[in-house]
């Protein structure tokens, strides 16, 4: 099994994916253990001094003015975890919780939080045992970090609350820790606060969304090319020189991907005999590279933000190398929240343009010779009429999900925390949007491949033939009389989600970016 080593200098998106989705094991580097011990020494020295230090010997938030006596400080740290574990609603997905815990461990290991090495090791042990704290949908405002979600994770480290075992069964956390030989942690000064105060949940969801959207943008180039081919469109608009004079990098990549898929097609540029030659195609076909390209460039910006966050140590207060413990505002989730919202907008638009191409394939007045709704016997059969309804419903929801969460803010903690990012909410709606986009592109794929097969007298591009063959091998049926459609659509959705479309096409086209 792959092992991820956690050091003091952050982590990578690949490591987050490996831990969250691949179940990779985690080890703390010797450098991290030394940094943890050094920072803990600073906290212990400050705890012994008479003057108050926020997070070490004071209350929290609006209660920070109270100086806490030494005999109450362990209770203070336990209490902050228990009281902040106030989430409600459905459970958050296992991969999100694993990403959240791993990213918190990454910050703890940086040596800027003052957490003891044994607490960090317990975090790694819990992840390695496949124990997943029960975390709920609601409870984070995205400022002072993802407080409630992280608190539920810290509660598990204490042996309290509920968690899911590696067998998928939810049990009391104390039972699961005991079954795996893990001793619950006894928190000391600052440790409870340090386990709660980070943007790890929203960052984990951003990292996973970026991986999913990279796949979906390549998928969208393929489905756009298939639709162009099925509509007998022209590939002249994909010429590199046209995109060079508007030098957005993502646009050129999208056009190149579409060109590679369409290479060798006998359908491209073929016009029905009764039609005048088309000078240009509809916007949803002709402008596909521009829309997908703009989204790709937004992905690139979001990756830059994610990489910076992955290299960050987010806590308040932080332990500095010169021995100071300083309050700061690095827990504010605005940088992550903004790009999460940007990506939801891009996903909505990519889904919107795909739906417009699908509708064009089904409309006999605009499909250039295809039967109405791609039906076998139109009138007796409805073909893919309602598949487009489903796609349209998904697009409509995508538009609602594109409304930014980060423009909202609601004060909390007696107006001490009077501006928040709502980044967790932005991340949650982006996860829904990513799933919807997958389904939208699956419907376009289903319609476009069916339409190409109905052009029986013309030879599709080799890449298109490979896509159709793989889709049929996956159990998605081709043209024919009406049948129960939902199983085909679900199979197409899984085909796209598992990356099988890209895997089928790339042996013909070469790698698609």
Language-model segments: which ranges?
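C-terminal auxiliary extensions adjacent to catalytic cores
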Residues: 1-24, 28-35, 39-47, 69, ...
